[in-house]
């Protein structure tokens, strides 16, 4: 049995899921209590603030950061450790981006996607039939 992999810790990068800054990345700078943490984000225009753990999701990215680091230090470490690019290259970020693109499709675009999926499914079925026949 495997335990938790994502712990609430200083330097853990989080994704905000509720409130005004939904979808923004931030990093835990300090732990206030068992329900709240101080977060800061140099990547997006996002003020340093205390936020509830229920309003964020912990990501797999952890920065090396001293406890209670000020915004300037956080910004330097953020750039040095290339957090924005690590996030952008993750499957999670790609899935969120795809979901956003899919939600903005109009009716004709959804129809075109359906046709392409049908074509792909047909090609797969033909290939499987050939493989079984051979």
UniProtKB/Swiss-Prot annotation:
GO terms for cellular component: cytosol; cytosolic large ribosomal subunit; nucleus; preribosome. It holds the Pfam family Ribosomal_L14e. One of its GO terms (biological process) is cytoplasmic translation. One of its GO terms (molecular function) is RNA binding. It is found in: Cytoplasm; Nucleus. Its main location: cytoplasm. InterPro entries: KOW, Rib_uL2_dom2, Ribosomal_eL14, Ribosomal_eL14_dom, Translation_prot_SH3-like_sf. Keywords: Cytoplasm, Nucleus, Ribonucleoprotein, Ribosomal protein. Component of the ribosome, a large ribonucleoprotein complex responsible for the synthesis of proteins in the cell. The small ribosomal subunit (SSU) binds messenger RNAs (mRNAs) and translates the encoded message by selecting cognate aminoacyl-transfer RNA (tRNA) molecules. The large subunit (LSU) contains the ribosomal catalytic site termed the peptidyl transferase center (PTC), which catalyzes the formation of peptide bonds, thereby polymerizing the amino acids delivered by tRNAs into a polypeptide chain. Belongs to the eukaryotic ribosomal protein eL14 family. Component of the large ribosomal subunit (LSU). Mature yeast ribosomes consist of a small (40S) and a large (60S) subunit. The 40S small subunit contains 1 molecule of ribosomal RNA (18S rRNA) and at least 33 different proteins. The large 60S subunit contains 3 rRNA molecules (25S, 5.8S and 5S rRNA) and at least 46 different proteins. This is Large ribosomal subunit protein eL14. It comes from Schizosaccharomyces pombe (strain 972 / ATCC 24843) (Fission yeast).
């Amino acid at each position: 049995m495997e335990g938790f992999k994502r712990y609430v810790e200083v330097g853990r990068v989080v994704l905000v899921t509720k409130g005004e800054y939904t979808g923004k990345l931030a990093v835990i700078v300090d732990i206030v209590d068992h329900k709240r943490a101080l977060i800061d984000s140099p990547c997006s225009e996002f003020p340093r603030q205390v936020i509830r753990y229920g309003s964020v999701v912990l990501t797999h990215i952890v920065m090396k950061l001293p406890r209670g680091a000020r915004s300037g230090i956080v910004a330097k470490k953020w750039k040095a450790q290339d957090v924005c690019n690590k996030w952008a290259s993750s499957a999670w970020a790609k899935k969120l981006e795809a979901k956003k693109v899919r939600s903005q499709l109009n009716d004709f675009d959804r129809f075109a996607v359906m046709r392409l999926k049908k074509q792909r499914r047909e090609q797969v079925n033909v290939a499987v039939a050939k493989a079984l026949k051979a």
